[in-house]
């Protein structure tokens, strides 16, 4: 597939997702980085988003809870170019009923080449990057060219 460039803005749109056993870990991470995160636009699956809002006062655009379709809503936003970074603390030791949604979310983040953190160390690397508060160019699939080729 041909690629094109997308510029991630200085003010990032960040999705925050956590499985039940990882929610407290994500909450701690958000609280530790609240001064940086408040400069960006935050999205989250339902329970996670509401817990973050309650604990920090940060404004969070909450989707549905993950098992009710929230993971798919975040994935749709990624496909539409509306999410720039995904912080997803998932529990590799416990299966969840919506595992296919989880796999689809991670697949879309990879397809659309956005930065993804699935653990605290990687999330710290992303947020501490010297480029985190700057516009950054990424390569993404050239969907218009892809569609034009398919419609020939």
From Swiss-Prot:
Belongs to the methylglyoxal synthase family. The gene is mgsA. Keywords: Lyase. Catalyzes the formation of methylglyoxal from dihydroxyacetone phosphate. This is Methylglyoxal synthase. Its EC number is 4.2.3.3. GO terms for biological process: methylglyoxal biosynthetic process. Pfam families: MGS. Residues 6-152 form the MGS-like domain. It comes from Escherichia fergusonii (strain ATCC 35469 / DSM 13698 / CCUG 18766 / IAM 14443 / JCM 21226 / LMG 7866 / NBRC 102419 / NCTC 12128 / CDC 0568-73). The keyword Lyase applies. It catalyses: dihydroxyacetone phosphate = methylglyoxal + phosphate. The active site is at 71 (proton donor/acceptor). PROSITE patterns: METHYLGLYOXAL_SYNTH, MGS. InterPro entries: Methylgl_synth, Methylglyoxal_synth_AS, MGS-like_dom, MGS-like_dom_sf. GO terms for molecular function: methylglyoxal synthase activity. Substrate binds at residues 19, 23, 45-48, 65-66, 98. It is an enzyme of class 4 (lyase). GO terms for cellular component: cytosol.
